[in-house]
A protein has these predicted regions:
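Conserved class I S-adenosyl-L-methionine
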Residues: 1-48
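Class I SAM-dependent methyltransferase SAM/SAH-binding core
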Residues: 50-94
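A short acidic, Gly/Pro-enriched loop at the edge of an enzyme's catalytic core
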Residues: 94-103
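A short SAM/SAH-binding and catalytic strip from SAM-dependent methyltransferases
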Residues: 102-118
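A short glycine-rich, Lys/Arg-flanked "PGG" loop and its adjoining helix->strand segment in the class I
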Residues: 121-133
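SAM-dependent methyltransferase
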Residues: 138-210
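C-terminal lobe and adjacent flexible extensions of AdoMet/dcAdoMet transferase-like proteins
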Residues: 202-257
Length: 257
């Protein structure tokens, strides 16, 4: 998608509607992450409007964030408890907070928002840079095959159908570059709006290699926040990484064993 600016995907209009339809996994994610934090400070890459950070903070975890979009930060600040979360504006692949954490996490497919393999590797390296010796980096994404219909790299999906508006996801996937170009088109009685976004889809195996290049190792992988075992039928994954030369992360099942 020519002249695409990643920051434009989360402008004022998108930020204003971002929480209109929550995924429903917020509390499960917060409980999972709280166990891993084990009383230590946490850092969320791409904290957004605080969809996960605020429930996690409600569990007593001190949460910091890094966020590219000033509009998403503004929405977070306007929420109850949002002013208690320290946020640094910047690119999560390179921006630092000056602290180390027991938990760094990146959810809702957001690793895909980095559009080159090098940037995705830099994101893993930045997570490693922020971890303490027993810290854990958590990544949650869909599996690419769950997004791309078999043999259909171009598709249109009806995301919302209402009496006065419809929202369509118009997409094209390039398996060579692994880039998925999407435009979320809202057609309503008040007009038409478009919200473009480009993602670079990667598999769990690719993430594991990126982690190794960044000095991390895979500790555990689940199919969801409920710790369902990851298998061939899974459509998403929650993966836990630790420093290659670090101790087993606190709060992980292997540590508990």
């Amino acid at each position: 998608m020519k002249q695409f600016d990643p920051a434009s995907s989360f402008g004022a209009d998108v930020a204003a509607r971002y929480d209109d339809a929550l995924r429903g996994d917020e509390e499960a994610a917060a409980q999972f992450l709280c166990e891993l934090a084990a009383g230590r400070r946490a850092l969320e890459f791409a904290i957004g409007t605080g969809r996960i950070a605020l429930p996690l903070a409600a569990h007593g975890v001190t949460v910091d964030g890094i966020e590219l979009s000033p509009h998403m930060i503004e929405r977070l600040r306007a929420k109850r408890g949002g002013d208690g979360i320290e946020v640094v504006q910047g690119d999560m692949s390179v921006t630092t907070t000056g602290r180390r954490y027991g938990l760094v996490y990146l959810v809702f497919n957001t690793i895909f928002n980095l559009l080159t393999a090098d940037d995705q590797i830099r994101c893993f390296a930045n997570a490693a840079r922020h971890l303490d010796g027993a810290g854990c980096f958590v990544v949650e994404t869909a599996l690419p095959h769950a997004w791309i219909p078999s043999g259909q790299p171009d598709y249109v999906h009806a995301e919302q159908i209402g009496l006065d508006a419809v929202v369509l996801d118009v997409a094209r996937y390039d398996p060579v570059t692994q880039l998925l170009e999407e435009n979320h088109v809202r057609i309503s009685t008040s007009g038409i709006t478009m919200n473009p976004i480009v993602c670079r889809l990667i598999t769990p195996g690719e993430m594991d290699l990126m982690a190794r290049l960044a000095g991390l190792r895979l500790v555990e992988r689940f199919a969801n926040w409920q710790r369902t075992p990851f298998d061939a039928q899974s459509t998403a994954h929650v993966s836990l990484y630790a420093l290659s030369d670090g101790v087993q992360p606190a709060g992980s099942a292997l540590h508990a064993a």
